[in-house]
Regions:
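Short, Lys/Arg-enriched, disordered terminal segments
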Residues: 1-2, 180
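S-adenosyl-L-methionine-dependent methyltransferase catalytic module, highlighting the catalytic core
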Residues: 61-62, 66-68, 72, 76-180
């Protein structure tokens, strides 16, 4: 089973092959993620993890297409990014892309964005997305923060269009499944 952590940095994810642009301790493969193709065969990867990387890459649609190329059918892909309204999205000068709740719908054939636009041949089911995973996973979320996350989860488009500019959440984690 091949599991890849793209843009791992210095943190080693157990059971994953770690890919980063820098040769840091724990990095298994040094590769620039703006250089295509990635050093993996078509249909060879079983699971992909990408934590706070996609916002640094100038062509995120091409990156997603490359992840799709190397993935097997039903590969699980987890991608975490700063939420576009968050101040974290803008404090890092190396961030070149910004993400809202509907960004991956352009790859999901169940969604009108994919059926009307078809910008890409890559197809992914958007299984779910989670706001502020790093807070909820560690159970460090206060009562009001948790209420806001729960509202945004139940009514993501309402939150994004009406409330997020007033009370922005920090991050989005997308859980995707490859369709082939």
């Amino acid at each position: 089973m091949i599991k890849i952590d793209f843009g791992c940095g210095a943190s080693k994810k157990p059971g994953f092959t770690d890919v980063d642009i820098l040769k840091l301790d724990g990095v298994d493969i040094v590769h620039n993620l703006t250089s295509f193709p990635y050093p993996f065969e078509d249909n060879s990867v079983d699971e992909i993890w990408m934590d706070n990387v996609l916002e640094h890459l100038p062509n995120p649609m091409r990156v997603v297409e490359e992840l799709w190329r190397i993935s097997k059918k039903d590969t699980k892909i987890t991608i975490a990014v700063p939420y576009f309204r968050s101040h974290y999205a803008f404090i890092d000068p190396t961030h070149v892309n910004f993400f809202g709740v509907n960004w991956f719908n352009y790859f999901d054939p169940r969604h009108v964005f994919w059926t009307k636009m078809q910008y890409s041949h890559a197809r992914l089911n958007v299984d779910k997305f989670v706001f502020d995973r790093e807070w909820t996973d560690n159970n460090t979320c206060g009562f009001l923060h948790r209420m806001l996350i729960n509202f945004a989860k139940r009514r993501p488009n309402t939150y994004e269009s009406k409330l997020s500019h007033l009370i922005p959440l920090n991050s989005l984690t997308f859980y995707l499944t490859v369709i082939k």
